[in-house]
Amino acid sequence: MLCGLSRETPGEADDGPYSKGGKDAGGADVSLACRRQSIPEEFRGITVVELIKKEGSTLGLTISGGTDKDGKPRVSNLRPGGLAARSDLLNIGDYIRSVNGIHLTRLRHDEIITLLKNVGERVVLEVEYELPPPAPENNPRIISKTVDVSLYKEGNSFGFVLRGGAHEDGHKSRPLVLTYVRPGGPADREGSLKVGDRLLSVDGIPLHGASHATALATLRQCSHEALFQVEYDVATPDTVANASGPLMVEIVKTPGSALGISLTTTSLRNKSVITIDRIKPASVVDRSGALHPGDHILSIDGTSMEHCSLLEATKLLASISEKVRLEILPVPQSQRPLRPSEAVKVQRSEQLHRWDPCVPSCHSPRPGHCRMPTWATPAGQDQSRSLSSTPFSSPTLNHAFSCNNPSTLPRGSQPMSPRTTMGRRRQRRREHKSSLSLASSTVGPGGQIVHTETTEVVLCGDPLSGFGLQLQGGIFATETLSSPPLVCFIEPDSPAERCGLLQVGDRVLSINGIATEDGTMEEANQLLRDAALAHKVVLEVEFDVAESVIPSSGTFHVKLPKKRSVELGITISSASRKRGEPLIISDIKKGSVAHRTGTLEPGDKLLAIDNIRLDNCPMEDAVQILRQCEDLVKLKIRKDEDNSDELETTGAVSYTVELKRYGGPLGITISGTEEPFDPIVISGLTKRGLAERTGAIHVGDRILAINNVSLKGRPLSEAIHLLQVAGETVTLKIKKQLDRPLLPRKSGSLSETSDADEDPADALKGGLPAARFSPAVPSVDSAVESWDSSATEGGFGGPGSYTPQAAARGTTPQERRPGWLRGSPPPTEPRRTSYTPTPADESFPEEEEEDDWEPPTSPAPGPAREEGFWRMFGEALEDLESCGQSELLRELEASIMTGTVQRVALEGRPGHRPWQRGREVRASPAEMEELLLPTPLEMHKVTLHKDPMRHDFGFSVSDGLLEKGVYVHTVRPDGPAHRGGLQPFDRVLQVNHVRTRDFDCCLAVPLLAEAGDVLELIISRKPHTAHSSRAPRSPGPSSPRML
């Protein structure tokens, strides 16, 4: 691994906690000592390590070397469990250059040891190490994949040593490579990360171009749990790639680790055979590159699978400790399944890597959105393994449109001379919406009506091949340009093509901030050559966008040109999507093919791709279908009528209201979610407040814009920010639905139309029983259906409000209570947050986790008992906040906002919740006091020991019917779970310190199965369920699996 990893001469004595003595090298050891004391400059990296030790303790490292020993001082051993080892900042073989600023070059071994012993509590080591290897060589048999790994911090580290990073000297720039995974650490326990993996991002923060110090600082700033995106290499053996018959595959794994494959049975020639169903990303099997989903398993360690059942094959595979020999029949590449295994991304090895500081990055990923795959797949590569999709954040690659089409518009004509086409465009270099009037449009090439937009493009290249971009302008190279130069050619598979934002015919307005119009063509080309030496260039580009006719509603088709390995530029979102609901286009890359058509907008719903319907298609499959399209892609689009500015067809009116606050509050409470296209509505009005006195604003009205800033595609937090900085005059654009009641609906948000309003067929599909979409796992069933008598649920995100009380001027104490306690019932919607702006609102949080529940300072009217109730109620809510039950808090608020205690199961998506009048119970304040003053939720930590006879824990789990969640279904009498106090309907929030609040049984059952002999659970329980004698109802014939 590192140069310092070399043997010590026999007979060396350990002179102390820091000492590693050694005899002077002689004879054959001289060359070894020379190698130890010098790392070539081009492979040398420097880092600073800071360690804080307790008084009387040691660092836990052994130092060898010194002027009287065999070379420079270096780390020869790290004591397991010691401070240095747990810091994950040092490797064996690292050279120590200085300690607290004192250089060790001229110190003897004993002097170094004395220095370390007396250095004090704070130790700063300057460390020299060998840089990790550079980018992998171009090899068509090596592909790079990425995987998202969630790790829990242990101390200040995650259990791995990170080296490399960007450097001022380009020759020393390296990827951020894991050079050591500490045994027993968080990364080792999780099992996915291996030495040599490259770190791409942490919690969505990209690290390409980051130095080693920056990367370490990012890791230190992470919270207790962090999401790492890691790249790893997979080498496909030639024998597998060219296989035409059965193969024998031998895989060596660490004892105790899992292979990472799951088996299934399929039918082949009317005979049941065992095949590979899925391969876990970054597992031993995945990294081997020898096995693929769909491969037919002929034998396992010499045992034929011809007459084995699936269960027997799975047990046989799990019983093998170190070396596994599988005889397989590889599935043909053309028959490999469309669905890949989890979050895996395939790239061409000859392309630039994301850790390289020269890789183009034109867009920041959004959490919760799936973007298109980052890299292209080589010709002939298996497409079933080239998909990237994660529920967190995946980076976007911007590909280019076909360079054979020289227009900036898809299917356009040849560009004219810059002298005849650029003169009239220069003065219009500003951003436009694609819905601009014809007054701001021009006639582009081919007679098409267009308007111009500008964007900034960052390209990364190298001095040899440059950026793959050629410019054209003027007649002579030394002639002063009267208009910007044109992009006249884009080299295939170059950075200019891969970025996806450039097309032939685009005008380059500036290069690295230097305008091109006042210079010469030679100067522009020189700027590009100089930028290539620095590996990076920033271009300001002007391009044409078609003035297309955009339907305000309804369904239509869009045809886009598509080139293999070049994406369309659309981002698909499914953060809150349920089965049967369409995918949403959440973002369109400016300058991409999709953007230049002028037809697509964020918020559009994607119904089909090339006539393949996406009703029940997972987002990963939709991305894969887009990737496999070539030449021409036909998209079926439905406009988002709720977000449409054209309101005639939606039965709604919009108008603008101007409010002058004069230092006072607006008197409104807004409600919404952090989903970009969920509506933001007015959920409460202060009695006799400014907004209510206008008579133009009502509860349930939807806010379309604040001070002329559209809220389309913006979450609630941005709307809150706009109100905070709005000033004295606030202009609200309001949308009011006329053909629907203005009072809050029982089914969710007032202003969000369900799919049933737009597509009756989709509505029928959306209303089917949940069992129709139940996963094919025999041990999973639903228990939430039996919870219909509960009013709240721990751990679910329900409706909520945030109503700061501090600055409500001119109102009674009753009005200064939280907005959901007032008379006007605002609309309720799962996971919604409300916000009431006030004149003193400077830094209100976006969520309700710091709500002020203190009673009013002035005396409140009414009996003292009511005031005491609200004080006790506020204290109870504060207790819920402190124990992490803010989402339960929102659910409690929902019940009081509507004045009812709901008896229906909760559903995470608005528009489908079956609120029925017959299932409501009116609640008086006295009843609510009785309901809410006792603890509404019990939290229990349960430790169970596996039954040695039955090898289980004596309980089964089931899914939530309408929400994600894992619940205890049945408890076996006298079993471990029964003796431990577990009860049916308990919700499992943690399993062995892993949060399962948002899991379903597909994720939780393997976690429970791998728990070993001791299982630690944190469960939530409603007090009244402890006395319920009803057994949970099974939704289907399948029986739950006993764990």
Swiss-Prot record:
Any GO CC annotation of this UniProt entry: glutamatergic synapse
Entry keywords, A to Z: Cytoplasm, Membrane, Phosphoprotein, Repeat
PANTHER family: GLUTAMATE RECEPTOR-INTERACTING PROTEIN 2, GLUTAMATE RECEPTOR-INTERACTING PROTEIN GRIP
Extent of Basic residues compositional bias: 422-432
Phosphoserine modification, residue list: 38
Organism: Homo sapiens (Human)
Highest taxon of source: Eukaryota
Family designation: Belongs to the GRIP2 family.
Listed Polar residues bias regions: 399-420
UniProt-annotated stretches for the region Disordered: 1-26, 373-448, 743-866, 1023-1043
Assembly and oligomerization: Interacts with EFNB1, EFNB3, GRIA2, GRIA3, CSPG4 and GRIPAP1. Can form homomultimers and heteromultimers with GRIP1. Interacts with the C-terminal tail of PRLHR.
Cleavable signal peptide: none
Compartments (UniProt record): Cytoplasm; Membrane
Sequence ranges of Low complexity compositional bias: 384-397
Xref: InterPro entries: GRIP1/2 (IPR043545), PDZ (IPR001478), PDZ_6 (IPR041489), PDZ_sf (IPR036034)
Name of the protein: Glutamate receptor-interacting protein 2
GO biological process: artery smooth muscle contraction; neurotransmitter receptor transport, endosome to postsynaptic membrane; Notch signaling pathway; positive regulation of blood pressure; vesicle-mediated transport in synapse
Domain remark text: PDZ 5 mediates the C-terminal binding of GRIA2 and GRIA3. PDZ 6 mediates interaction with the PDZ recognition motif of EFNB1. PDZ 7 mediates interaction with CSPG4.
Domain PDZ: 48-131, 148-234, 248-332, 456-545, 557-641, 656-738, 941-1023
Function summary: May play a role as a localized scaffold for the assembly of a multiprotein signaling complex and as mediator of the trafficking of its binding partners at specific subcellular location in neurons.
Membrane topology of this protein: Peripheral membrane protein
Bias (Acidic residues) ranges: 843-854
Compositionally biased intervals (Pro residues): 1034-1043
